[in-house]
Amino acid sequence: MASPIAGIWLGTLHAGGSSLRLQLRIDTGNGGSLRCTLDSIDQKAFGIPCSDVKVSGDAASLAVPAVRGGWSGSISSDGKILTGTWTQVGPGSMPLTLERQQHAIEAPASAAPMPAIPPVPIDQIKSLLDKELADALAKGLLAPATHAGVTVGIVQHGQKLVFSYGTAKDDSVYEIGSITKTFTSLILAQMVEQNKVRLDEPVRELLPPGTVAKPAGAEITLIDISTQHSGLPRMPDNFHPAHPDNPYADYDAKLLYEYIGKQGVAKPANPPFLYSNLAVGLLGQALANRAGQPYPALLKAEVIGPLGMKDTAITLTPSLQARFIQGYATPQQPAHAWDLDALAGAGGIRSTAADMLLYLQAQLHPDQLPPPTLAAANGKTLPAALAMTHEVRAEVGDGVHIAMNWFHVDATGSYWHNGGTGGFSSYALFNPEKDFGVVVLNNYAPGDNSIADKLGLHIAQRLTGLPAVSLAP
């Protein structure tokens, strides 16, 4: 017998003066479990996975981890209407009623890839992009009315290039969001090389005594977290921001430990890939505990100090703050900066394109770090630590594996990660075999208004002579 919630549902979410059509597709999979995807139609985001679909009597609920949201409410007696509340980190709670539909609204056809051209050398890439982005600059994502700014950094065979479009400057400071996770994994690798921790060490052993009970069986280790196979959820269930526009600011170590104490650190049998901000934030906090210093100080000591990344920080100095570009959620909605406390290791870094090129150059050539880096405190372990973070360790799916918080595309040999906050998006990629790296920093939150992922991948494809994703507005 089909579940009363199975079917196609359509509703409109009203938030911040704008309206978004949301569509749920729910069916029953093998074994009777409910499967669900969310479509944000007006944002052109389709097929976002749901989880924890539950029905009890006329009550129903589901979670959408990818957007840190979920819906709960009730099913009408005739089974045609879902009445309830959409709750999401940032916007908060909003009423959302959905009606049963006979047919789904399908995703529009994506723009065809731009034809392949011979590989473009670094000294010609900007002139090509100026032409390819002309429409976006005139009437699309980078048009003056959007307030958008984007800074691009490219390194190829040791040659570096930084340039900007829109409201950005070459030295603008951005939030890099979840690219921070790769820094946290590099700290882990550094501390392994320094014999301060082990990859297979239980995370419990790095937490204050009594925080969480030792499980009866296998427990979550540091490498489980660094490969996103810990089994921990994307976010803790005691995450209730006092200020939705700066949601992570008041989530401190006390709340984190309280949650972990309740959740436990038992490792599921054969845990699947499950992307978790909570887990990597916990890793950053745990490593800081072992090092005996706060995460920002540990980050500086192990990574950004030795690499000479002077414009990279968790908390900005006055001079960096003066270059911190305004972020946007939408063209009409400036975004508050995000300040991360206990979960800083998952997404708290701010940086510039030039500094990120120092980081990517180190990724490309761990065995060729400059003498000042090797001579710095903690610098001598960086070559081995960087190499450790590149080792492919688990499958993600669809030709993608994961190293230590770097995704690895099997077909191209590229490593990448992206990031997003309330007003910023970012994309970083490097390819050791072809010896190039790309970073794109954008002052728009991820979604329909962001160009970071698309532009970053496009540049990588142009550098290597592959058909390139369209930059059409």
State the predicted function of each range.
Residues 161-163, 211-220, 230-238, 296, ...:
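Secretory-pathway/luminal and periplasmic proteins that interact with or process carbohydrate-rich
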Residues 142-148, 156, 168-277, 291-293, ...:
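Active-site-proximal loop and beta-strand segments within enzyme catalytic domains
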Residues 3-77, 83-96:
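Central antiparallel beta-sheet cores of small beta-barrel/beta-sandwich binding domains
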Residues 79-81, 85-163, 288-291, 297-301, ...:
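Catalytic loop of the DD-peptidase/beta-lactamase superfamily, centered on the K-T-G motif
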Residues 184-185, 279-284, 357:
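Well-ordered alpha-helical segments within folded domains of soluble proteins
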Residues 183, 190-209, 290-318, 370-386:
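Short, well-structured active-site flanking segments
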Residues 26, 53, 73, 98, ...:
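A structural signal for short hydrophobic beta-strand segments in well-ordered beta-sheet cores
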